[in-house]
Amino acid sequence: CWNQPQITTCSHLVVILAAIDAVKPESGVVERKFKRREMPQEKVDFYINLYASHLANTLSSDENIYSWTAKQTGIAMGNMMTAAAIKGVDSCAIEGFEKEKVEEILGLDLTKYRLSVIIPFGYRINEQSSQLREPLENVVEFIK
């Protein structure tokens, strides 16, 4: 990961994967999720077919599925980073890394999983530099 100090010096490193295969109807994951709702099999089949049709129309390739599932991992990432901050633990979401190289090192089956984001956790050594952020009114528009 280009020897980024956040990665080389952190105490814990979380690698979040996008589960490409799990969202496909034939994986069985989708069916298990619908069956948890304790509905008749005909209804389960109906929803699986509806889902499969949606997937075929909108997420027709593994690349499209990766793009969507990688975005979904942001929900987990945000929750982890917020929980860490509440506990006083620093973190940094990193998307800038050599994806293929890291996937190879991890030995991922790319038909099932792809690397989405890396999050180092720990405590900073130096004081944090001041943040030069845009004023809120320059980046957010409230619509009434």
Task: Say what each PLM segment does.
Residues 1-144:
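Acidic, surface-exposed loops and disordered segments
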